[in-house]
A protein has these predicted regions:
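Glycine-rich phosphate-binding loops of nucleotide-dependent enzymes
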Residues: 1-195
Length: 195
């Protein structure tokens, strides 16, 4: 439910046009296109140019300025001409965030955005999420507690499909029911349990 509208039965394209975009746990970019070409594809919908099999290069080039702005936001301008397949995983996730930003979303849904990343990429993507969250809502599934503690304003902990606790990180991380459910004892600190 977003803005009092149920979106579950709607096709993804309709949901995206309402300002809701999602990014899956597995990176979904076009591997054999360049970084800027990936962003231009995302921009076609928001600029009124729906994706078609063929577009003249001049029409696509007209989107380069906005595509480069988006790449600046995610620190990928220097990779604009690079084929996406050669990017490290963390940079691919940043590219995916740039493509979601192309739709100018109000609400971003991120599924474990730092899953499978090395420490350097985790820090880079965490910082990126903080920056792009300004002025929009980000709903994120994340199991890395250091990421959660540095990004989230409000945390909701689920156990077996039910809300176990909700609130700021400090309150939730010290909640005995949360500790019991996830650590097996209420004496264990969640703080150091990042993975």
């Amino acid at each position: 439910l977003h803005r009092a509208v149920e979106h579950a039965p709607d096709p993804p394209g309709h949901v995206a046009r309402r300002g809701i975009v999602r990014s899956y746990q597995i990176s979904s970019v076009f591997p054999h296109l360049t970084v800027i070409e990936n962003v231009r594809i995302a921009l076609q919908r928001s600029t009124g140019l729906s994706f078609q099999f063929w577009r003249s290069e001049s029409i696509l080039d007209s989107m380069n300025a906005r595509a480069l702005e988006l790449l600046d936001q995610v620190d990928l301008r220097g990779f604009a001409g690079v084929e996406t397949v050669s990017l490290p995983y963390g940079r691919k996730r940043a590219l995916e965030i740039a493509t979601t930003l192309a739709t100018e979303p109000e609400l971003m849904l991120l599924d474990e955005p730092t899953q499978g990343m090395g420490h350097e990429d985790v820090a880079r993507v965490t910082d990126l999420i903080k920056r792009v969250a300004v002025g929009r809502t980000v709903l994120m599934v994340e199991h890395n507690m250091s990421v959660v503690s540095s990004i989230a304003n409000t945390i909701t902990v689920l156990a077996r499909g039910s809300v176990l606790a909700e609130g700021p990180y400090q309150a939730v991380s010290n909640n005995p029911a949360v500790k019991e459910a996830y650590m097996g004892t209420s004496e264990t600190e969640l703080e150091g349990m990042a993975h």
